[in-house]
Amino acid sequence: MTSIGTGYDLSNSVFSPDGRNFQVEYAVKAVENGTTSIGIKCNDGVVFAVEKLITSKLLVPQKNVKIQVVDRHIGCVYSGLIPDGRHLVNRGREEAASFKKLYKTPIPIPAFADRLGQYVQAHTLYNSVRPFGVSTIFGGVDKNGAHLYMLEPSGSYWGYKGAATGKGRQSAKAELEKLVDHHPEGLSAREAVKQAAKIIYLAHEDNKEKDFELEISWCSLSETNGLHKFVKGDLLQEAIDFAQKEINGDDDEDEDDSDNVMSSDDENAPVATNANATTDQEGDIHLE
């Protein structure tokens, strides 16, 4: 079957002969062009981090937040079309408020994931709407512990130990997999903050010609009493310093290895001398 739309991408409610919805696939492309966002599930909470590119010197620092508070115990971050992400955040807030008004208790995060997933999936069924060009990572803490989910433009959502989306998702996923392998017992919330900063800095290496701001938030039973809050001040600076030190340390090791190889080659190289040169008793070489 062909990999292009050939007319089957003109409507959101039509499948191609090989069972594909091209409008959803195009929405995924919009997500892949977005800035890198990650989420890490730790021992007693979750940590979110996002790379915010500075597109203009006129932007006010720390004002254009991308990590959002959905409910007191739920946070989210997204990659893709920013207006679509803001709309989903507002819809999520409505769902959380509606649940609390009806049942007199904060919405469980799995129930929140199901409601928001159904809303996103409904936008893949009708000709009068289009899919959301955004992938959302959300999570928090409820009475059953910590939860982390990622919601895709198709409306499907999955629970994760670590999730990444956006342009730098491949390198970010590789680092998250290393974390899971090296820390099977899990991370503390503070350690997860440092690792999240490091992963965002590593993911930014492919786009290093552009400046960016690092934004981090967390929701932890031990650190924030189960509330979703932004990481600021000394802790944020400590995470940034840790990330830069780790990355610069790796670069220094690579340079040392290359220097050692060059030194070894120099030792084995023959010494060129002039045929008319003579050596005195003290070993100095003089040209005749």
From Swiss-Prot:
| SUPFAM superfamilies noted in UniProt | N-terminal nucleophile aminohydrolases (Ntn hydrolases) (SSF56235)
This molecule's function is given as: The proteasome degrades poly-ubiquitinated proteins in the cytoplasm and in the nucleus. It is essential for the regulated turnover of proteins and for the removal of misfolded proteins. The proteasome is a multicatalytic proteinase complex that is characterized by its ability to cleave peptides with Arg, Phe, Tyr, Leu, and Glu adjacent to the leaving group at neutral or slightly basic pH. It has an ATP-dependent proteolytic activity.
Q: An example of a Gene Ontology BP annotation on this entry?
A: proteasomal ubiquitin-independent protein catabolic process
Subunit details for this protein? The 26S proteasome consists of a 20S proteasome core and two 19S regulatory subunits. The 20S proteasome core is composed of 28 subunits that are arranged in four stacked rings, resulting in a barrel-shaped structure. The two end rings are each formed by seven alpha subunits, and the two central rings are each formed by seven beta subunits. The catalytic chamber with the active sites is on the inside of the barrel.
What family does the Swiss-Prot or TrEMBL record give for this protein? Belongs to the peptidase T1A family.
Query: What is the name attached to this protein's record?
Result: Probable proteasome subunit alpha type-7
Highest taxon, organism lineage: Eukaryota
Source organism (scientific name): Saccharomyces cerevisiae (strain ATCC 204508 / S288c) (Baker's yeast)
> Which residues fall in a compositionally biased region of kind Low complexity?
269-279
Entry's localization field: Cytoplasm; Nucleus
Report the transmembrane regions from the record.
Answer: none
